[in-house]
A protein has these predicted regions:
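Paired small-residue
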Residues: 72, 83-91
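Intracellular juxtamembrane helix-capping segments at the cytosolic ends
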Residues: 98-112
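Pair of pore-lining "gating" transmembrane helices in MFS-fold secondary transporters
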Residues: 1-10, 90
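Helix-to-loop junctions at the C-terminal end of transmembrane segments
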Residues: 44-58, 142
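Short amphipathic helix-loop junctions that connect adjacent transmembrane helices
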Residues: 15-34
């Protein structure tokens, strides 16, 4: 579920962001630059995300990623300036990296070696089906309710994952 939420939240906001930027008076070039920085933020941390998981644990790295995704929403809700859009997109990228890589690594922890390939395949199916759905939904929500609504909508999904992760960290596994 953490992978579905992390990828879904990222795709939902990323899909709407460039359109929202142009709708709020920013140039297409600035919207494109925001997405370029977002992509760097998505993949740049990969050089050390694995080491962070070894040192701090997959659950903690995933939780930090979810918090960064939420911070992205907070920054986006803070205003409509270029710095708000770019800052939000950068946090969205880093948050996705930590949360998605951590979540993906946790999938195989729950299964026997014989089940892992099938579990990973099912996980990927749900992740990318949800991503396709929210990508379509993002445009509709942006058009009908606006950029602020897009960003408010991410918090319940993030809480759905973050609360159990924090609970697990506090009280351990049963």
């Amino acid at each position: 579920a953490a992978g579905v939420v992390s990828y879904g939240v990222m795709a939902f906001v990323m899909t709407a962001a460039p359109v929202a930027m142009v709708n709020h008076g920013h140039s297409v070039d600035n919207a494109a630059l925001g997405i370029q920085w977002h992509l760097l933020a998505m993949f740049g941390p990969s050089f050390f995300t694995g080491r962070l998981m070894v040192r701090y644990g997959k659950e903690r790295v995933t939780a930090v990623g979810m918090v960064l995704l939420a911070a992205s929403g907070v920054v986006a809700l803070g205003g409509l300036g270029l710095s708000h859009f770019w800052g939000s997109l950068a946090l969205l990228g880093i948050g996705w990296n930590f949360s998605f890589i951590g979540a993906t690594a946790m999938v195989t922890d729950c299964h026997t070696p014989a089940e892992r390939s099938k579990a990973q395949g099912m996980n990927d199916f749900f992740v990318f089906a949800a991503t396709a759905a929210v990508s379509f939904l993002a445009g509709s929500i942006l058009h009908s309710s606006g950029w602020q609504a897009v960003n408010w909508m991410i918090f319940p999904a993030l809480a759905l994952i973050l609360v159990p992760l924090l609970w697990q960290g506090r009280y351990g596994r049963n």
